[in-house]
UniProtKB/Swiss-Prot annotation:
A Gene Ontology cellular-component term: small ribosomal subunit
Subunit structure: Part of the 30S ribosomal subunit. Contacts proteins S8 and S17. May interact with IF1 in the 30S initiation complex.
Name under which the protein is recorded: Small ribosomal subunit protein uS12
Gene giving rise to this polypeptide: rpsL
UniProt GO BP: translation
GO MF assignments: rRNA binding; structural constituent of ribosome; tRNA binding
Taxon lineage: Bacteria, Pseudomonadati, Thermodesulfobacteriota, Desulfobacteria, Desulfobacterales
Pfam family, one: Ribosom_S12_S23
InterPro entries in alphabetical order: NA-bd_OB-fold, Ribosomal_uS12, Ribosomal_uS12_bac
Keywords for this protein: Methylation, Ribonucleoprotein, Ribosomal protein, RNA-binding, rRNA-binding, tRNA-binding
UniProt family annotation: Belongs to the universal ribosomal protein uS12 family.
3-methylthioaspartic acid modified-residue sites: D89
Its biological purpose: With S4 and S5 plays an important role in translational accuracy. Interacts with and stabilizes bases of the 16S rRNA that are involved in tRNA selection in the A site and with the mRNA backbone. Located at the interface of the 30S and 50S subunits, it traverses the body of the 30S subunit contacting proteins on the other side and probably holding the rRNA structure together. The combined cluster of proteins S8, S12 and S17 appears to hold together the shoulder and platform of the 30S subunit.
Length: 123
């Protein structure tokens, strides 16, 4: 335990919060190019084939990003917009791809929650 004099001289150090999306360099989104598009299986109680892409960002980092929604048109060399947000049952996937921007199409036939999947309003 420090003395009063030591606290006057140095003060207490604030514990720094670890950043959850370091590859975005403090920004809301970053553009990147897909280097690999693949499926991955989730952690223990769940079972599925989750769509994931390896993306090289403009910051120079390469990250794994989840492709949300049903069906996608992404291939190698597709240009995508990446936002933060992890996928709880996929270890190492801490980013999401934004649907409906750049080379990523929106989800077809989406009626509810359209803004999250880049779907246009149905006529």
């Amino acid at each position: 335990m420090p003395t009063i004099n030591q606290l006057v001289r140095k003060g207490r150090k604030k514990a720094e919060k670890k950043q959850s999306t370091p590859a975005l360099k403090g920004g809301p989104q970053k553009r990147g190019v897909c280097t690999r598009v693949y499926t991955s299986t989730p952690k223990k109680p769940n079972s599925a084939l989750r769509k994931v892409a390896r993306v090289r960002l403009t910051t120079g980092m390469e990250v794994a990003a989840y492709i949300p929604g049903m069906g996608h048109n992404l291939q190698e060399h597709s240009v995508v917009l990446v936002r933060g947000g992890r996928v709880k049952d996929l270890p190492g996937v801490r980013y999401h791809i934004v649907r409906g921007t750049l080379d990523t199409l929106g989800v077809e036939d989406r009626k509810q929650g359209r803004s999250k999947y880049g779907a246009k309003r149905p006529k």
